[in-house]
Amino acid sequence: MASNPNAVEQEILQAVNSAQTTDKRKAHEQSLAYLPVEEERGVNVVGSKMKPRYIALTCDDVTRIFYIHRLKVNDKGGMTVVKSWPLFELQNITVINDHDVTMTINKPHLLRTQDTSARDRFVFSVAKNYMYYMGRPLSVTTTDGRKVDWAYRNSFADNKPNLYPAKSLAIPKARSSLPENSSEQVSSSFNSRVAHNRNFSDGPIVTNLETDQPRIEKKLTIDSSRSAKKKLSVEKERRFSDNKPSSNVSRGTPSSAHSDVIEISSSSAIARTSGDRKDDVLFDTSTQRRDNQTREMFIQEQAQLFPSKPSLRKTTRREQAPSFNSGTSSSERGKNSISGSYEKNTALALEAGKYNMSQKDVKLSSSLESNTFASDFSKVDRDATQAALSSSLETPSVLTSSYKPSSSSKVSAKSVSRKPTGAPAIPKLPPKHPSRQPTVRATPSTGKQIEPPNDEPSIGNELLPLFESLRFENRKTTSKPKAKKTLVTSIPTKPHQASVEKVYDLNSKINLKNIPEQSISRLSTLKWNEGTTIKDVLKQTEFSFDGAIISSVENLAEEEIELQNIKSQLQDCALGCESINSTINLFSLELSTALNGVINIEQQPSRR
């Protein structure tokens, strides 16, 4: 190997720049560091197991890409590039001992050096430029997996290698140590956090919006809270025992009793809490006075704006009860909870009474309105209206059924004046059979027919809007009985109609009068025998239909057989085409061999 470092560097640069890159251009690379190493030979190579090589780290001036090159020394002089890798393919470096190191690029490459300091400088340069190029530190470890400290620290300041001066950057330390005053900063920050910590079990901090300072609240200890709970339970039992006789005596007037209880409980609670506030809590009286003034001003403005509307009960209750947000402590909240519960129960009872009274007023007003609105229908029989509503849901054939006339309906004078002068008669449905024709009466004076009366009670004319689809005729009954005339209607006979009628009457309940004219004309054209029925006709049609289907299926089967035959013929044609193709290929091969033989025969005398 060459001993002059500058000469070695020049040879490396010349070899690297003369090598063709992937884009077929001359490289313009600068050498950053190089290391003479001995690399293992292959297993099948006879002779020395190690071969001399150079490992160089370079950077291209144009593309700004870092490379790792492996070079070998030629026998005639100079160097050639054996293998090149971009720096980002380098995975890690493992330091085995003072002489051996492994670089993993897709696979581990064992490199042996005689100069340990040169090896260390090269590894440091690679790690430094890897950090600059990739933005993350390179893994340089020992065989045990421990990090190599000298690969991350600039401990080679006196003997710097040939680094690239333009882009050399300081590598940040992998294990950054804390500054000298770090413990003081940590302790001060911890103390500041502890100073701002607060136990939020008593509730959030209530701040004054004017001064933006937290109000002073006295924290209760666990023992004091337990004693306060015991006192509250004792006072609650005593209050219940004191209030029981007063509530029993004043059952007749519950509202007055509840009001007395409210006044007594609230006054006693305020008296007790006012004595405890001086010792337990220190609060700002100016803010409380200001809140009371604003509340009073709001009540006055409300009274001026709404003079007729009484003041709400909730506002009065809020005025009597002490406000918790204005500076009361948790002990006062517990003491005032009993009086607040009494006030809530009594207020709910009073509001329930008011609601019942308001419901009664609403019922009275609605009843008065209904009386004034429905004064015309006060004399209408309810049973008659219900029967009419039920009859409206039935089929219209009910109207044609015979029944006995009922008594005249009770209708007011106003409803009679609103009765229409006349309405067209309802179209009658045809009966099921000519023998079931109903009897129809006709008056001698007027030739109009009168329908038979209905069994349902008569309906007032004021309910006519409910039966817009059903229209009634003005009925005029006479006191004297008159002779009844039966009118029998019949349909004119057509050819073969009697036989058709017999067939339908035997096998179904269908009436010929309900069948459309087109179907009747179609049936009349058919040739019916005396003993034939619809079932026989259906059987005949089914038999003919089945025969047609069977014939069509047979035709389809025959066509399918023909298609299969055609398919087999096509397959035979394809096989014949393939055989023809193969024979053509054989002929072409024979021709080519024959031509080659002819050409060889012609060339032999020329060579001789």
UniProtKB/Swiss-Prot annotation:
Pfam families: Sec3-PIP2_bind (PF15277), Sec3_C_2 (PF15278). InterPro entries: Sec3-PIP2_bind, Sec3_C_2. One of its GO terms (cellular component) is cell cortex of growing cell tip. GO terms for molecular function: phosphatidylinositol-4,5-bisphosphate binding. Residues 243-262, 322-340, 436-448 have a biased composition (Polar residues). Residues 175-262, 302-340, 389-461 are annotated as: Disordered. This is Uncharacterized protein C17G8.12.
